[in-house]
């Protein structure tokens, strides 16, 4: 009986020490993850979204709007964002981090809409302009869309008239209105968020270590 118990204990220890049961170390750095496709923040926010019971809505344009490729910003650059919203919005790393914050507030569609408008303004092909303009309307302007952005009636009327002959700049008024909303409403909370503070800390530590 004693030998049988001893052999069972040894078998249990062997299973618990097997390589397949060991948890791999997560070596993904916070400051790297903001700019790469394996964003830790994205994973964490998706987990929070699943646990909250809120079903995510994926739109046509959002499927295109993945995190932008960018270089890791310096600590000085990250700190400068707190003084200048325009400067942050001009950098891919800044937009990526701001987008992660907006996702926690369920207002990511504001930035996605702004990015889609920026993309439309670069388009020169008439058919492509018409297609992108229609997709933007369906995803962010239509009252039937789960990603509808908040616009006043005047701007909506301008957009509806422009749909008859779409142009690359047809959403400029709406884009400015959403940009102003993000600047005045979301940006102050972003600067006080744990997402921004942790990113500042991580970039500062990365700079000091190098």
UniProtKB/Swiss-Prot annotation:
What does its PTM field state?
A: N- and O-glycosylated in synapsomal membranes. Serine phosphorylated in synapsomal membranes.
The protein's UniProt keywords, in alphabetical order, are:
Cytoplasm, Glycoprotein, GTPase activation, Membrane, Nucleus, Phosphoprotein, Signal transduction inhibitor, Synapse, Synaptosome, Ubl conjugation
- Tell me yes or no: is Signal among this UniProt entry's keywords: no
Q: Where is the RGS domain?
A: 84-200
Broad class of the protein's primary localization: membrane
Q: Where is this region: Disordered?
A: 1-21
| Alphabetized SUPFAM superfamilies for the sequence | Regulator of G-protein signaling, RGS
Post-translational modification Phosphotyrosine, affected residues: 137
Q: Which InterPro entries match?
A: RGS, RGS_sf, RGS_subdomain_2
**GO MF entry, a single one:** GTPase activator activity
Give the GO biological process terms.
G protein-coupled receptor signaling pathway; negative regulation of signal transduction; response to amphetamine
GO CC annotations, alphabetized = cytoplasm; membrane; neuron projection; nucleus; synapse
State whether it acts alone or in a complex, and with which partners, per the record: Interacts with GNAI1 and GNAQ. Interacts with GNAZ and GNAI2. Interacts with OPRM1. Forms a complex with mu-opioid receptors and G(alpha)z/i2 subunits, including GNAZ and GNAI2; the formation of this complex results in mu-opioid receptor desensitization. Interacts with HINT1.
Function, please? Regulates G protein-coupled receptor signaling cascades, including signaling via muscarinic acetylcholine receptor CHRM2 and dopamine receptor DRD2. Inhibits signal transduction by increasing the GTPase activity of G protein alpha subunits, thereby driving them into their inactive GDP-bound form. Binds selectively to GNAZ and GNAI2 subunits, accelerates their GTPase activity and regulates their signaling activities. Negatively regulates mu-opioid receptor-mediated activation of the G-proteins.
What name does UniProt use for this protein?
A: Regulator of G-protein signaling 17
């Amino acid at each position: 009986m004693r030998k049988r118990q001893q052999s069972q204990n040894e078998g249990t220890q062997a299973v618990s020490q097997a390589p397949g049961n060991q948890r791999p170390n997560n070596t993904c750095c916070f400051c790297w993850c903001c700019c790469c496709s394996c964003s830790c923040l994205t994973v964490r926010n998706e987990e929070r979204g699943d646990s909250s019971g809120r079903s995510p809505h994926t739109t046509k344009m959002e499927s295109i709007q993945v995190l932008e490729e960018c270089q890791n910003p310096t600590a000085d650059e990250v700190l400068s964002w707190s003084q200048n919203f325009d400067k942050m919005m001009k950098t891919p790393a800044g937009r990526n981090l701001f987008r992660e914050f907006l996702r926690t507030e369920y207002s990511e569609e504001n930035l996605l809409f702004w990015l889609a408008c920026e993309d439309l303004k670069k388009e020169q092909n008439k058919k492509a302009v018409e297609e992108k303009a229609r997709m933007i309307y369906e995803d962010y302007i239509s009252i039937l869309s789960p990603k509808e952005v908040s616009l006043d009636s005047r701007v909506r009327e301008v957009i509806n008239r422009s749909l008859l002959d779409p142009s690359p700049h047809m959403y400029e008024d709406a884009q400015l209105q959403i940009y102003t909303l993000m600047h005045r409403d979301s940006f102050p909370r972003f600067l006080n968020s744990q997402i921004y503070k942790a990113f500042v800390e991580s970039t500062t530590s990365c700079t000091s270590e190098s």
